[in-house]
Design a protein with these regions (language model features):
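Juxtamembrane segments of multi-pass membrane glycosylation machinery
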Residues: 23-24, 42-69, 88
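Transmembrane-lumen/periplasm boundary regions of multi-pass, lipid-linked membrane glycan transferases
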Residues: 13-24, 35, 41, 49-52, ...
Length: 506
C-alpha cells in the first residue's frame, strides 16, 4: 500500500509544521524553503477531528489522507467542468478513470505535500472559468468570477509555483486571443465588476491565509514580495537563498526522462496518456477547450523543463492537464461516427489498463528505488533506526524530559536523551519517527557540539552521527556499548546515488 511507504524528508518536515500549528494554534509563513498554509490548516483540522492535538500524537495515515481528499475533490471538480463544457456526464467519468489511474497522480495523492492541493485548486479555477464562459444571467457571471478569484487565491496560498501555471494558461490563451474579433468579444463579455470580483477574491483569500487569519501581516509581505524572489533564486538553482536548491538542478530533458524514459511499466503509462491527449487535441474538429488544455499542459511542461530546478512532483499539474485534455478530446468524438467512438473508448481502456498496472506495481513495494517518482526519498531503514532508539530510551530509568531542543545541554538535564549530530538535510525524516521522544532529543549539525557535550560530563543514552565520524564517538562516550549502521537515504547505483549512511550508538 502506498500509505505504508517510508515518510519522505519533505513530508516529515511538513508534518512537524502541522504539529506546531496544532500545539500553538498559529502559523507563521516562512518564504525560504516552505510553502503556503492551506495544507497545514486542512491537515490540522483533520487531526483535531480525530482528537490529535500535538506533534507526538499526529497520525501519519491521517496526514496522508489530507491530500487524498483533495485529489478526489480535484477529480470531481474536473468532471463538473467537463459537464458544463459538454453538457454530458460521460466525459467526467472518463476523466475520473484516466486521472484516477495516472501512476504519478496515485503516488503523490498520498504524499503529504502541497502538489495535490494545488491541482485541486487549479481544477477549481477551470471549473469556475467554464461556468463563467457559459451563457447565463449577469448575476451568475459575477458569482463565477468570484469563485475563480477565490480558487486562484487558494492556489497561491498553497504553493508559489502556481504562478507558473498562471503563466502557462496565459500562453495557451494567446492563439485564441490572436483570432479576429476575439478582443472585442472579451470586451463585450467581461465587465469591470467581474474583474473586481476576480481580483478581490484572489487578494482577500491570499491575505487571510498568509496572515494567519489577520494575526501576522508580515506573512502577507513575505508571500507577495520575499517569496517570489526566493523562489526565483531557487528556480535557477541558486543555493545562496534556498537550502539545497543546487541538489535539484537537472538538465532540460530530465522531466521527459522521468515521465517517458524510465522503467517501461511507468513510461508506457505516461506515453499512452500523453499520446491520447495529443491526438485528441490535434485531430480535426477538436474543441477549443481541448486545445486550450493541451496547450496549457505543453506550455507548463516547457516552462518547468527550462527552469534548472526540478523535482518529479512539480509535474503533477502537467499530467492532470493531460488527463483533462484526453477526456475532453474523447468527448469531442462522441456522437460522431461510430468507429471513432469505438476507437476513443478502446484508447481510454488501454491507457487506464496500462496506468492501473503501474499503480498496482507501486502498491506492492512503495519504497522501491526503481519507481521514478521515489525521488530524494528516505531509506526504509530509518524505521528500524527509530525502533532501536525507542527501545533504548524506554529501557532507561530516568525519563526526565529536556526543556529545550537544538541548544547545548547543561548538567541540569539528566539522561535519557538522544544526541543527534548530522547535517540538517540528512536529519530528516528521523525527527518524524522519533517524535515521541522529541522533548528528549537534541539536534546539532557538527561533531564539535558532541565534544562540548562530553566536556560537561553528560552521558547521552543514544548518539547518532554520520558514518565517517562513527569511530570518534566511543572515545567520547565509552558507556555506549552497542552500535549499528543505517542508511538514512538509500544507495541507488543505477542513478549514481551514494546514499546517506549513519551510525547509532546506545
Amino acid at each position: 500500500m502506498l500509505f505504508d511507504r517510508t515518510f519522505h524528508p519533505d513530508e516529515a518536515n511538513q508534518a512537524f509544521t502541522t504539529g506546531r500549528l496544532l500545539e500553538t494554534g498559529s502559523y507563521t509563513y516562512q518564504p525560504q524553503d516552505h510553502h503556503g498554509p492551506t495544507l497545514y490548516y486542512a491537515a490540522a483540522a483533520l487531526q483535531r477531528s480525530a482528537g490529535n492535538a500535538s506533534t507526538a500524537a499526529l497520525d501519519g495515515t491521517l496526514l496522508r489522507c489530507t491530500p487524498l481528499v483533495f485529489a478526489v475533490i480535484a477529480i470531481i471538480l474536473g468532471a463538473a467542468a467537463l459537464k458544463r463544457i459538454t453538457g454530458r456526464l460521460t466525459p467526467g467519468a472518463i476523466l475520473a478513470a484516466l486521472l484516477g489511474t495516472v501512476p504519478m497522480f496515485a503516488f503523490f495523492a498520498t504524499d503529504f505535500i502541497q502538489e495535490t492541493l494545488l491541482v485541486c485548486f487549479l481544477m477549481m479555477m477551470f471549473w469556475a472559468g467554464a461556468g463563467y464562459l457559459r451563457p447565463g444571467p449577469k448575476w451568475k457571471t459575477g458569482t463565477w468570477a468570484l469563485m475563480f478569484g477565490t480558487a486562484s487565491g487558494l492556489a497561491f496560498a498553497t504553493k508559489e509555483t502556481c504562478l507558473l501555471s498562471f503563466a502557462a494558461a496565459a500562453m495557451a490563451a494567446l492563439p485564441f486571443l490572436a483570432r479576429r474579433g476575439a478582443i472585442d468579444k472579451i470586451r463585450e463579455r467581461v465587465c469591470a465588476r467581474d474583474a473586481i470580483m476576480v481580483t478581490g477574491g484572489f487578494a482577500l483569500t491570499a491575505v487571510i491565509l498568509y496572515s494567519d487569519f489577520g494575526r501576522n501581516f508580515q506573512g502577507v509581505y513575505n508571500a507577495f514580495i520575499a517569496a517570489p524572489l526566493s523562489y526565483l533564486h531557487r528556480g535557477v538553482g541558486d543555493a545562496t537563498t534556498s537550502t539545497g536548491a543546487n541538489w535539484h538542478v537537472h538538465p532540460w530533458w530530465w522531466y521527459a526522462s522521468i515521465l517517458f524514459g524510465g522503467k517501461s511499466i511507468y513510461s508506457l503509462a505516461a506515453i499512452a496518456l500523453a499520446a491520447l491527449a495529443a491526438v485528441c487535441a490535434l485531430m480535426r474538429g477538436a474543441g477549443r477547450a481541448t486545445r486550450f488544455v493541451f496547450l496549457y499542459a505543453f506550455a507548463l511542461f516547457a516552462i518547468h523543463s527550462i527552469l534548472p530546478y526540478k523535482t518529479p512532483w512539480c509535474m503533477l499539474p502537467v499530467v492532470s492537464a493531460l488527463a483533462l485534455a484526453a477526456a475532453l478530446g474523447i468527448a469531442d468524438v462522441m456522437g460522431r461516427k461510430r468507429h471513432l467512438y469505438i476507437l476513443a473508448a478502446l484508447s481510454a481502456i488501454i491507457v487506464c489498463d496500462t496506468q492501473l498496472t503501474a499503480c498496482v506495481q507501486m502498491g506492492r513495494n512503495p519504497d522501491a528505488t526503481d519507481i521514478p517518482y521515489n525521488y530524494a526519498a528516505a531509506s526504509p531503514e530509518v524505521k528500524e533506526l527509530a525502533a532501536i532508539v525507542a527501545s533504548a530510551m524506554s529501557s532507561a530509568t530516568n525519563h526526565e524530559p529536556l526543556t529545550t531542543n537544538h541548544k547545548p545541554l547543561t548538567t541540569n538535564h539528566a539522561p535519557p536523551f538522544i544526541a543527534v549530530a548530522l547535517p540538517a538535510a540528512d536529519t530528516w525524516p528521523f525527527p518524524w519517527y522519533n517524535r515521541q521522544w522529541e522533548p528528549n532529543t537534541g539536534y546539532w549539525t557538527s561533531f564539535d557540539d558532541l565534544k562540548r557535550l562530553a566536556e560537561t560530563g553528560i552521558k547521552p543514552t543514544v548518539v547518532i552521527v554520520p558514518m565517517e565520524e562513527g569511530h570518534l564517538v566511543q572515545p567520547l562516550f565509552p558507556h555506549l556499548k552497542h552500535t549499528k549502521r543505517f542508511y538514512m537515504r538509500p544507495r541507488i547505483p543505477a542513478r549514481n546515488v551514494r546514499g546517506v549512511r549513519v551510525r547509532v550508538f546506545w
